[in-house]
């Protein structure tokens, strides 16, 4: 290029980097520079630019720092190598390489700044990935060693180059490295390890014509020796992090790397320690064979002296953290998290893995366990949580849990875990607001919802640790927990009795008592587990029972006035009773009396405020559930006093002000006793008729007329209410501005009295749920009980469905507008839904409830309560119908069910809100599809699913289009927002849409296609493709995919969901397509379905790959695209044609045809992905982003990633998921194709 051309380039760079440039001039200058990058001759220009000196810059009028020009020149090389290297002749390649090597070795100014060194390294990395051991062979290592022998900057450049190659090969999804992975691996091995080690490991030489150098010490030794220099250590440690997980362990031992790294961990500066601990983590967690020489190093790290040193480093790091200046970037805190994870992994990977355990000794198990205890005690709950999974696994391990060197930790483990049963999310408000724990929690977890989720899961882990510890040492645990009970519960009784106001959930005293009760619950669960696993020690069990009886007597004598404490006490007493009262009906009677007293706790006192009444009502509701739970746990003893219980409950029903829900729970209690007990089937059937018959009769007597919506509204008094409001208040008034006077309050009370006929609906649903639950206890009786229900359901279900139809009609805009101006206004106000959502609503939950209360003390109460009645009636109907579905054929054989169901739920779907749709999908549609017998699917599912899927698809597409036009407001991962209050409603609406979108995706993927997120994709695909070999009823997934009427709208919906900006939903949908695509593009598939996948779905996938929003999911999308291309080969070329139609690819001669040929020859999915990624990169379809590690071995200890790991570990083992004792009881769319 002549001098004028160079001057134009420099002037363009001036314009781009000048803050004074206008937008138009900057855009024009950038366009010139981009055109230069795309030019085949760009390397020659880059060479000219790099050969310019300061004087030449001045003469050409360049005002920029020379390093900016150097960086741009190197970017020309980088782009040209990426786009044109294959087109270069060997002479051109050698020319480029030689020039770059020369300036790297000779131009010290070029390497003086980091960003230029990094760009130069990137150029060498791109060349090496394409040409190392092609035309550029041993000379490459010679060049790197030449760099190493020069200055610090030269050594950094050599390390950057090698590290970049290793990371692209092993940590990043790099298509170029993937296509030459075998050659690059052997090339790296040849220079990392010493010549002597290589000859030992590869006596026949390395494959792929890679030579073993002569007398080469190898880069591992070279880096290891350089660790003694603090200036070089950082880059060397980074290189070790990139190779220690896969390089030969003989080379690691030869270079004495671990010893050097441990020395840095003990004595090095903080910034080196952080990288050193990453290296140690990689070493102790890497896969090793039983004869691996690295075991000696692992065992040495588990020696008492090494553990003592780790303990010292841990303590010193923890103490060095200044809590007042704590932040997510505090180096000491980052190191502490990495250190904690490494210590825990050291034991979890080696002590708790039955295969790895054979290679080490357990002599230091006690020292190690005490070190993990220190981690558990740390005030940071995030640090403490790192240890939890280790303890749960260790306590379940039959060898470790019984080892004498492990048992020494039990007393302190029990103490720490019990103390940490505290509800920290509430404690930080009043109990520990200024504590270190509160400060750590505030820094680690953002948002109310995230804090509650994390603390809840943290507490469940601690609960399980207490439970498992007790199940191993019951007697010792009993003595400690009884003493704790005396000090925590009984020791605070005086303060509790002196309280004149009810506790709140953040009250310090309540939280302290809650910890005590939770410890007791965990202990009782632990005792039960011990008894189930130990059947040969009745004497010890008898001692435990005697102590439990005396303990329970103390609890029974406690009389709390506070509703929240009463709830906790009742919960504990029910647990005690389930263990003790099988032989002690007196105790059972006392506990029953206490529960019934709580259920009938007076809530009418004039001294009670709104929050007080709420607490009492919540307590009564919880105690009703505890009563039913007692009936499930103790049906036989309760059956002995059934007549007395029924008499008491009948009296309560007649004499007290029980709500409909409370009546339902008491009747359910009686029903559960009769059906769960061991009396003979004839007696059970008699009680069934005795208990269910009156409820059915009551419902048939009180059920509203449902022939038309107006008839229904007349029955529930809407016209009368509207007339009353019209006469008393101005038209279209704001009723919250008018006081609820005595006359209006009396009228409202009469209206509410007339609405108490709801309870039989819910009661029948509860009875049916109990019948289905009893199937697991008395499976032989279930068929007979289904027959009893089969007689009842034809009398109940049709009218319930008709009632749902009329309810839905009340929400339909066309019906509302036809009621007249006044009535229309009132009904419209009644059905307005108000929500409070974590992280979205701009007010607290208590403020939301207070606002609702204010509505109820104004004239608006008439409207508000009417809307609440409609919602409650709808929920009861949904619940009852869903419960009946669990009976299977007994429900689905109701005459005319399919037509009635379709009419009820979809004839007025236009008025359903996002929340109502979500509720209907989750509560009704899912069980309807799951429980429908295979032989009735043509009758019950075939008419429903096409209409349902089309309606959902239309709803979601239209709502997302509207919200995208407005602009997204809610960050998926964010729980707190700083938006203005006037955006709250829009944000709530967007959140509700995300909920419906996710519910729809789960319905299709998990229910219809029967693909769960935890299933192996290969297993799912093989099971679907191999369905012809499976005997028995056709699976729902096969039925859905084999019916074109259903499959078409299903695939359309999934295709639309694939590009919605909601990562949770898209993750499910991508997983589903990965599973079903092999079947749907096979030769056996219908041609229309196959073409839909290869055209519409494939186009959506390419659009998603092009969308920066899906950056983190790019690998999965490319995988799906490869599966479509691969499985459709030889059947249809639609997907290939679509690729060839993309202008950015079609404009490049022979690019797509060459890709087709290589793709067809590719032997693995990894190679196919690399080929497709390279193709899309050539067309710049994949957005340019920072490289993302996909196989990184190092620890990401950002709070977000640590919380993700913690959430995964919450799902422990299958045993625990199915173990009732482990449950904590308080868990109530681009112009790309144009």
Swiss-Prot record:
One of its GO terms (molecular function) is nuclear import signal receptor activity. PANTHER family: EXPORTIN 1/5 (PTHR11223), EXPORTIN-5 (PTHR11223:SF3). It comes from the Eukaryota. This is Uncharacterized protein C328.01c. It comes from Schizosaccharomyces pombe (strain 972 / ATCC 24843) (Fission yeast). One of its GO terms (cellular component) is nuclear envelope. One of its GO terms (biological process) is RNA export from nucleus.
């Amino acid at each position: 290029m002549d001098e004028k051309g160079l001057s134009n380039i420099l002037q363009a760079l001036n314009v781009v980097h000048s803050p004074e440039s206008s937008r138009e001039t900057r855009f024009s200058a950038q366009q010139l520079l981009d055109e230069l990058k795309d030019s085949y001759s760009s390397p020659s220009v880059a060479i000219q630019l790099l050969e310019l000196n300061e004087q030449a810059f001045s003469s050409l009028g360049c005002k920029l720092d020379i390093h900016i020009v150097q960086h741009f020149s190197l970017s020309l090389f980088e782009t040209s190598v990426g786009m044109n290297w294959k087109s270069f002749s060997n002479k051109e390649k050698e020319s480029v390489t030689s020039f770059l090597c020369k300036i790297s070795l000779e131009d010290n100014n070029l390497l003086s700044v980091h960003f230029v060194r990094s760009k130069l390294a990137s150029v060498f990395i791109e060349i090496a990935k394409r040409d190392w051991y092609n035309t550029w062979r041993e000379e490459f290592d010679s060049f790197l060693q030449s760099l190493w022998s020069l200055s610090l900057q030269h050594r950094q450049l050599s390390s950057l180059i090698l590290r970049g190659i290793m990371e692209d090969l092993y940590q990043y999804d790099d298509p170029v490295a993937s296509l030459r992975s075998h050659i690059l691996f052997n090339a790296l091995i040849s220079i990392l390890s010493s010549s002597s080690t290589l000859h030992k490991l590869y006596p026949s030489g390395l494959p792929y014509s890679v030579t073993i150098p002569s007398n080469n010490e190898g880069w591992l030794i070279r880096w290891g020796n350089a660790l003694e220099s603090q200036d070089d250590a950082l880059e060397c440690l980074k290189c070790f992090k990139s190779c220690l997980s896969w390089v030969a362990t003989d080379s690691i031992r030869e270079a004495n790397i671990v010893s050097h790294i441990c020395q840095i961990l003990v004595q090095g500066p903080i910034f080196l320690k952080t990288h050193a601990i990453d290296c140690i983590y990689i070493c102790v967690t890497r896969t090793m064979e039983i004869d691996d020489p690295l075991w000696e190093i692992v065992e040495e790290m588990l020696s008492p002296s090494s553990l003592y040193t780790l303990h010292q480093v841990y303590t010193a790091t923890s103490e060095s953290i200044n809590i007042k200046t704590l932040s997510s970037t505090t180096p000491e805190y980052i190191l502490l998290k990495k250190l904690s994870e490494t210590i825990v992994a050291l034991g979890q990977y080696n002590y708790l893995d039955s295969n790895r355990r054979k290679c080490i000794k357990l002599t230091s198990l006690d020292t190690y366990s005490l070190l993990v205890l220190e981690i558990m005690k740390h005030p940071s709950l995030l640090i403490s949580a790192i240890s939890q999974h280790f303890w749960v696994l260790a306590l379940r391990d039959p060898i470790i849990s019984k080892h004498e060197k492990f048992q020494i930790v039990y007393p302190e483990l029990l103490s720490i875990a019990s103390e940490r049963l505290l509800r920290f999310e509430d404690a930080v408000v009043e109990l520990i607001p200024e504590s270190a724990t509160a400060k750590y929690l505030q820094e680690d977890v953002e948002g109310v919802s995230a804090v509650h989720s994390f603390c809840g899961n943290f507490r469940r882990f601690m609960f399980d640790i207490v439970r498992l510890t007790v199940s191993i040492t019951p007697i010792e645990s009993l003595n400690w927990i009884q003493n704790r009970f005396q000090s925590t519960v009984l020791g605070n009784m005086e303060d509790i009795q002196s309280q004149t106001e009810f506790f709140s959930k953040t009250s310090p005293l309540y939280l302290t008592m809650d910890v005590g009760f939770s410890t007791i619950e965990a202990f009782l669960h632990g005792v039960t587990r011990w008894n189930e696993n130990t059947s040969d020690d009745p004497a010890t069990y008898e001692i435990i029972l005697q102590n439990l009886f005396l303990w329970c007597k103390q609890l029974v004598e406690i009389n709390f006035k506070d509703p929240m404490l009463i709830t906790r006490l009742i919960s504990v007493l029910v647990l005690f009773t389930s263990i003790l009262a099988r032989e002690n009906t007196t105790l059972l009677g006392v506990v029953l009396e206490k529960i019934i007293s709580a259920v009938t706790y007076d809530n009418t006192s004039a001294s009670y405020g709104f929050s007080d009444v709420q607490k009492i009502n919540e307590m009564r509701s919880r105690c009703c559930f505890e009563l039913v739970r007692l009936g499930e746990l103790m049906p036989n003893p309760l059956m002995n006093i059934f007549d007395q219980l029924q008499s008491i409950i009948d009296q309560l029903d007649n004499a007290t002000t029980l709500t409909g829900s409370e009546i339902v729970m008491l009747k359910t209690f009686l029903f559960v006793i009769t059906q769960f007990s061991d009396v003979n089937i004839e007696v059970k059937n008699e009680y069934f008729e005795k208990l269910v018959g009156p409820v059915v009769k009551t419902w048939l007597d009180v059920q509203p007329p449902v022939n038309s919506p107006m008839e229904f509204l007349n029955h529930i008094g809407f016209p009368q209410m509207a007339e009353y409001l019209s006469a008393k208040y101005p038209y279209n008034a704001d009723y919250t501005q008018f006081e609820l006077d005595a006359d209006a309050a009396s009228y409202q009370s009469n209206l509410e009295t007339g609405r108490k006929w709801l309870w039989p609906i819910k009661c029948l649903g509860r009875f049916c749920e109990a019948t289905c639950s009893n199937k697991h206890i008395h499976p032989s009786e279930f068929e007979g009980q289904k027959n009893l229900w089969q007689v009842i359901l034809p009398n109940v279900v049709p009218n319930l469905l008709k009632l749902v139809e009329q309810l839905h009609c009340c929400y339909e805009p066309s019906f509302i507008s036809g009621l007249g101006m006044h009535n229309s206004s009132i009904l419209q106000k009644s059905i307005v839904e108000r929500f409070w959502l974590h992280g979205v609503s701009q007010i607290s939950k208590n403020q939301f409830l207070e606002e609702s209360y204010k509505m109820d003390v104004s004239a608006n109460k008439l409207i508000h309560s009417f809307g609440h009645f409609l919602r409650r009636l709808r929920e009861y109907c949904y619940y009852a119908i869903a419960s009946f579905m669990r009976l299977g054929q007994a429900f689905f054989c109701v005459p005319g069910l399919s037509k009635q169901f379709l009419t009820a739920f979809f004839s007025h779907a236009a008025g359903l809100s996002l929340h109502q749709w979500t509720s209907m999908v989750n509560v009704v549609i899912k069980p309807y599809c799951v429980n429908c017998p295979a032989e009735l699917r043509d009758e019950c599912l075939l008419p429903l699913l096409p209409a349902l899927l089309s309606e959902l698809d239309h709803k979601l597409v239209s709502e997302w289009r509207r919200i995208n036009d407005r602009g997204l407001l809610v960050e998926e991962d964010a729980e707190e927002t700083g938006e203005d209050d006037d955006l709250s409603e829009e944000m709530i609406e967007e959140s509700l849409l995300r909920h419906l979108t996710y519910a729809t995706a789960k319905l299709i993927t998990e229910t219809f296609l029967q693909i769960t997120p935890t299933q192996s994709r290969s297993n799912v695909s093989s099971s679907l493709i191999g369905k012809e070999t499976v005997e028995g009823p056709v699976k729902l997934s096969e039925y859905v995919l084999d019916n074109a009427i259903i499959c078409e709208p299903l695939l359309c919906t999934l295709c639309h969901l694939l590009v919605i900006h909601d990562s949770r939903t898209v993750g499910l949908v991508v997983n589903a397509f990965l599973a079903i695509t092999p079947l749907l593009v096979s030769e056996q598939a219908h041609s229309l379905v196959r073409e839909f996948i290869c055209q519409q779905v494939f186009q959506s996938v390419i659009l998603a790959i092009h969308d920066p929003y899906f950056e983190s999911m790019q690998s999965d999308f490319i995988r799906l695209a490869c599966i479509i291309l691969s499985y459709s080969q030889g059947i249809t070329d639609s997907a290939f044609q679509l690729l060839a139609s993309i202008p950015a690819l079609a404009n490049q001669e022979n690019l797509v045809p060459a890709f087709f040929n290589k793709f067809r020859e590719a032997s693995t999915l990894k190679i196919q992905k690399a080929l497709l990624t390279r193709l899309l990169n050539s067309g710049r379809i994949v957005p340019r982003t920072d490289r993302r590690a996909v196989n990184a071995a190092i620890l990401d200890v950002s709070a977000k990633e640590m919380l993700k790991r913690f959430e995964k570990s919450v799902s422990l083992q299958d045993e625990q998921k199915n173990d009732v004792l482990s449950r904590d009881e308080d868990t109530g769319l681009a112009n790309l194709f144009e």
